[in-house]
C-alpha cells in the first residue's frame, strides 16, 4: 500500500484491511471493496475517526440508514 495514498482501515473478517480512500467513499462500498469474509452477517459495525466512535450500526440496520461517508484515516471495525 502506498503510504502517501490516503486509506480507510478495516478490522475484522475482510480480505483487505486497507481500502484506498477517495472522495465519496461510503461505509458499504468500503466493506464491499475490502471483501467481507465472515460466515455470518456482522452483528456490529463501528466507525472510528480520530479515536472517537462516529458511527455505530447493528449489521442488518446498516441497510436501513443513509450510507455513511468515510474520511481518510477512518477505521471500520466489523464484529460478527
Which stretches of residues belong to each language-model region?
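Ser/Thr/Pro/Gly-biased, low-complexity, turn-/loop-rich segments
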Residues: 1-80
Amino acid at each position: 500500500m502506498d503510504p502517501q495514498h490516503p486509506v480507510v482501515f478495516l478490522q475484522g473478517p475482510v480480505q483487505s484491511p486497507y481500502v484506498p480512500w477517495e472522495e465519496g467513499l461510503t461505509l458499504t462500498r468500503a466493506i464491499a471493496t475490502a471483501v467481507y469474509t465472515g460466515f455470518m452477517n456482522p452483528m456490529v459495525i463501528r466507525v472510528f475517526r480520530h479515536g472517537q466512535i462516529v458511527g455505530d450500526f447493528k449489521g442488518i440496520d446498516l441497510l436501513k440508514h443513509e450510507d455513511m461517508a468515510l474520511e481518510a484515516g477512518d477505521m471500520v471495525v466489523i464484529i460478527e
